[in-house]
Swiss-Prot record:
Provenance organism: Microchaete diplosiphon (Fremyella diplosiphon)
Predominant localisation class: membrane
Annotated protein name in UniProt: Phycobilisome 30.8 kDa linker polypeptide, phycocyanin-associated, rod
Family to which the UniProt record says this protein belongs: Belongs to the phycobilisome linker protein family.
Coiled-coil segments on the chain, per record: none
Membrane topology recorded in Swiss-Prot or TrEMBL: Peripheral membrane protein
Presence of the UniProt keyword Membrane in the record: yes
Location(s), subcellular: Cellular thylakoid membrane
Residue ranges of domain CpcD-like in the record: 219-271
Keywords of the record: Antenna complex, Membrane, Photosynthesis, Phycobilisome, Thylakoid
PANTHER family: PHYCOBILIPROTEIN APCE, PHYCOBILISOME 32.1 KDA LINKER POLYPEPTIDE, PHYCOCYANIN-ASSOCIATED, ROD 2-RELATED
C-alpha cells in the first residue's frame, strides 16, 4: 500500500505504511491477538475498550478457529456494545455513515446509499442492516473472510467514486481521534450528499474542522494534485505529479473527468 504524499497532514500515515491485518490458515496466538485488537479498533471507531466490554465468547471462538474474521467483525457490530456506542445515541443517517466507515472502510458515495440502508433498517431491522455491509460483494472483494476491515476511503481504486475521497475525511479526523470524541450525533454528509457537493479537505489536526461546513462555498478555489494511475501490466516508473486549481462549482466535474482519464487523486485542499 503506497503512502500518500499528504498522508501525515491528513492523519492516515499509520494506515498507508501498514500491512493488512489477516488471519492466515496457519496462525500463532500472537497473530490471533493482533486480529482481535485490530478488529476492535476498526469496528469501534478507535474507541477505548474496557476489559469488561470485551466479547470473550466471540474471541474464544476465533481463537479456536470456529469462526472467521468476518464472523468476529459481525459479532462486534451486532453486539449490544456497538449499539450503545453508535446506534442509540446517533441519528439514523449518522449511524449509517459510521457503519460505512467501520465495516467498509469508506464514506457513503451518494444519497442513494443512505436511502438503501434506511430502507433495510426500517423494513428488516438492526441485524439485517449490519449484515447488508458484511455480506456485500464489496466486503467480500476487499476483505473476504480473513482480513480485518481497514480504511480505504483515502485511496483511489478501481470502482471507487472520486467524491468518496474528500467525504471520507469528513468522517475520519486522524489516527488518534475517536468517532464519539467528535461529538456528532447528526449525519455529517447530509448536505453534501443531498446537493451532490464535495467538501474541502483540511489536515487532521486543523481545529477549525470538526464536521461539515454548510455555508456558501461558491467563492472558494481548490488545489488538486494528481498522478497517472499505474497500469497493472506497465513497468514501474516514477510518475510526475500534476497540480490544478479549480473553482468550487467545477470541482465535481473535474474529479469525474480525472477519474475517466485514469488519474489518481493525491490530495484536495483549499487553494
Amino acid at each position: 500500500m503506497a503512502p500518500l504524499t499528504e498522508a501525515s497532514r491528513l492523519g492516515v500515515r499509520p494506515f498507508a505504511d501498514s500491512d493488512k491485518v489477516e488471519l492466515r490458515f496457519v496462525k500463532t496466538a500472537e497473530e490471533v491477538r493482533s486480529v482481535i485488537w485490530s478488529a476492535y479498533r476498526q469496528v469501534l471507531g478507535n474507541e477505548h475498550l474496557f476489559e469488561s466490554e470485551r466479547l470473550s465468547s466471540a474471541e474464544s471462538l476465533l481463537q479456536q478457529a470456529q469462526i472467521s474474521v468476518r464472523d468476529f467483525v459481525r459479532a462486534i457490530a451486532q453486539s449490544e456494545l456497538y449499539r450503545q456506542k453508535f446506534f442509540y445515541s446517533n441519528s439514523q443517517v449518522r449511524f449509517i455513515e459510521l457503519n460505512y466507515k467501520h465495516l467498509l472502510g469508506r464514506a457513503p458515495y451518494d444519497e442513494s446509499e443512505i436511502a438503501y440502508h434506511v430502507d433495510i433498517y426500517t423494513s428488516q431491522g438492526y441485524e439485517a442492516e449490519i449484515n447488508s455491509y458484511i455480506d456485500s460483494v464489496e466486503y467480500q472483494q476487499n476483505f473476504g473472510d480473513s482480513i480485518v476491515p481497514y480504511y480505504r476511503g483515502y485511496q483511489t481504486t478501481v470502482g471507487q467514486k472520486t467524491a468518496g475521497f474528500p467525504r471520507f475525511f469528513q468522517l475520519y479526523r486522524g489516527y488518534a481521534n475517536t468517532d464519539r470524541a467528535q461529538n456528532k450525533s447528526k449525519g455529517q454528509l447530509t448536505w453534501d450528499l443531498a446537493k451532490n457537493l464535495v467538501s474541502p479537505i483540511y489536515p487532521a489536526d486543523a481545529g477549525s474542522l470538526t464536521g461539515v461546513s454548510t455555508g456558501n462555498r461558491g467563492g472558494n478555489t481548490y488545489r488538486i494534485r494528481t498522478t497517472q494511475a499505474a497500469s497493472p501490466n506497465s513497468p514501474r516508473i516514477r510518475q510526475s505529479i500534476s497540480r490544478v486549481v479549480v473553482p468550487f462549482d467545477q470541482l465535481s466535474n473535474l474529479l469525474q473527468q480525472l477519474n475517466r482519464q485514469g488519474r489518481k487523486v493525491i490530495s484536495i485542499a483549499l487553494s
